[in-house]
UniProtKB/Swiss-Prot annotation:
Belongs to the ROK (NagC/XylR) family. It comes from Klebsiella pneumoniae. ATP binds at A5, F6, D7, I8, G9, G10, T11. The lineage of its organism: Bacteria, Pseudomonadati, Pseudomonadota, Gammaproteobacteria, Enterobacterales. Homotetramer. It catalyses: D-cellobiose + ATP = 6-phospho-beta-D-glucosyl-(1->4)-D-glucose + ADP + H(+). GO terms for molecular function: ATP binding; beta-glucoside kinase activity. Induction: Highly induced by cellobiose. To a lesser extent, is also induced by gentiobiose, cellobiitol, and methyl-beta-glucoside, but not by arbutin, salicin, esculin or phenyl-beta-glucoside. Is inhibited by N-ethylmaleimide in vitro, but ATP affords considerable protection against the inhibitor. This is Beta-glucoside kinase.
């Protein structure tokens, strides 16, 4: 059985054709401007039309998501997905079974299914992207929360609020590549689109003093949040995900900056890089549509 898998991000849509055992058979990526939800939906339908052999749809998406009904009550940066019944919408248009799960939860499920957490009972995932995402695995169970909001680590404060809006002092506003890029672009007077995370870390490695300061602030904010998570959940490991972790030497750099917090040994990176969301989405599909006589999934 082939599954069409989609990993929806704030700036890109990753698409795949996957076997039910998690093997990736084909992938593609499409840039998404301005978190355009309608464009995302059309791209998904086009991918499905081009791959008629797929018999199911597995989706990793941002926001607060009921993993059973597929209702997205808040779509993160994609406002089109607020209060959107994505599962029903796609099933009506395709006639295929559909599963929808939060993106960070999918990264966690991939790590548990086919990664370094296969034998772990307690671990966390923290993803660094347009925002900070998170997922919790406690006593052999994925924790969704009463309103499907568990793991929203990005709302943790990294400093004492000094203004009216505490969100300005959250991890989302201080520990993401989006914020890092924005701050460096402002400093050098360049358009945001011309400044990438890769550029900043390259200049950090080259000794650029501004990049050295900004990257240190970035890791310091992460350190505050990760320190709190270690002492709240007592995890075996916190796995860090997101495109930035694929940079050579990132884990070593992360551990160096966070050594002061005394938590470096708790940290690792996810096993599947940018494919983690697709793999975890298929795992969730398997769980939702598990047949009684099929224990492989």
């Amino acid at each position: 059985m082939k599954i069409a898998a989609f990993d929806i991000g704030g700036t890109a849509l990753k698409m795949g054709v996957m076997a039910r055992d998690g093997r990736l058979l084909e992938t593609a990526r499409q840039s998404i401007n301005d978190s355009d939800g309608d464009r995302i939906l059309q791209a998904m339908l086009s991918w499905l039309a081009a791959h008629p052999s797929c018999e199911g749809i597995a989706i990793s998406a941002p926001g607060y998501i009921d993993p059973h009904s597929g209702l997205i009550t808040m779509g993160g940066a994609i406002r089109r997905f607020d209060n959107f019944a994505m599962k029903s919408w796609l099933e009506t248009r395709t006639g295929l079974p559909v599963s929808v799960e939060n993106d960070a939860n999918c990264v966690l499920l991939a790590e548990r299914w086919q990664g370094k957490a296969a034998e772990m009972a307690n671990f966390l995932v923290l993803t660094i992207g347009t925002g900070i995402g998170g997922a919790i695995f406690c006593q052999h169970q994925l924790i969704n929360g009463a309103r499907f909001r568990a793991g929203e680590f990005g709302y943790m404060l990294t400093d004492r609020p000094g203004g009216r809006d505490p969100r300005r002092y959250s991890m989302n506003e201080n520990c993401t590549l989006r914020v890092l890029r924005h701050r460096y672009a402002q400093h050098i007077g360049a358009p945001l689109d011309s400044v990438t995370g890769e550029l900043i870390f390259d200049r950090y490695d080259a000794g650029d003093p501004v990049c050295q300061r900004l990257v240190a602030e970035f890791f310091n904010g992460l350190g505050h949040g990760l320190y709190n998570l270690v002492h709240i959940f007592d995890p075996q490991t916190i796995f860090i995900g997101g495109g930035v972790v694929e940079r050579p030497g990132f884990l070593t750099l992360l551990r160096q900056h966070l050594a002061w917090f005394g938590i470096a040994d708790y940290l690792d990176t996810v096993s599947h890089g940018n494919d983690a969301g697709l793999i975890g989405a298929v795992y969730h599909f398997n769980q939702l549509y598990r047949s009684p006589d099929d224990d492989r999934h």
